Regions:
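Short linear sequence signals and composition-biased patches located at protein termini or domain-edge surfaces
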Residues: 129-174
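Short, low-complexity, intrinsically disordered N-terminal peptides in bacterial proteins
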Residues: 1-2, 173
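Ser/Thr-centric signal marking residues that sit
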Residues: 7, 112, 158
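Aliphatic-rich helix starts adjacent to a transmembrane/signal segment
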Residues: 2, 6-61
Length: 174
């Protein structure tokens, strides 16, 4: 039969071993959780940026008119069909760290962003502006998705030629 002091000593030793193990494992678990959070944030930045880029490329590529004159720094005007089947002017623009689309009827739809105030995931125009075009060449789109609190960035840049420019719509073929 064991004495009460020995049982108490066994219990204290077990408690000490468990707490020593916890002290060794908790920093590792904390770093794992931090890495998971950084991965989740990076994935969200990439998803949002790729969605915005894909949407803009498709709309600019299918523009019904030449891109000349449509590029204005952080805004781009393009023509597309409306719900009634007529052509209307749409506009991409940046407002308060969000990419927005102004529809042909004047309504504005956000393409990025979740809130009306400051964004955790900010849409920032790249280099000098969001849209650039040199002498009738391709339209260059450049922007960054930025996470305010973690200081993470994902940069996006591509060029696209509208079909109207590529096929020289409105010009006489010889």
């Amino acid at each position: 039969m064991r004495r009460k002091g020995v049982i108490l000593l066994d219990g204290l030793m077990a408690l000490f071993l468990i707490s020593a193990l916890a002290v060794m494992v908790l920093p590792l678990a904390g770093s794992w959780l931090s890495a998971l959070e950084r991965g989740r944030t990076g994935t969200k930045l990439s998803e949002t940026g790729l969605f915005a880029m894909d949407f803009m490329v498709e709309k600019i590529r299918n523009n019904r008119h030449s891109a000349a004159g449509g590029v204005r720094g952080n805004s781009y005007d393009y023509r597309d069909f409306t719900a009634r089947g007529t052509e209307g002017t749409y506009r991409f623009f940046v407002d308060r760290e969000k990419l927005k689309l102004q529809l042909y009827n004047g309504n504005i739809q956000p393409l990025t962003g979740e809130y009306t105030g400051p964004e955790a995931y900010a849409f920032l125009p790249g280099r000098s502006s969001l849209f650039r075009q040199v002498e009738g060449g391709p339209v260059t789109i450049s922007f960054a998705m930025h996470h305010q609190m973690m200081g993470m960035d994902r940069d996006f840049e591509t060029s696209v030629i509208p079909y109207a420019d590529f096929y020289k719509k409105g010009e006489v073929y010889e």
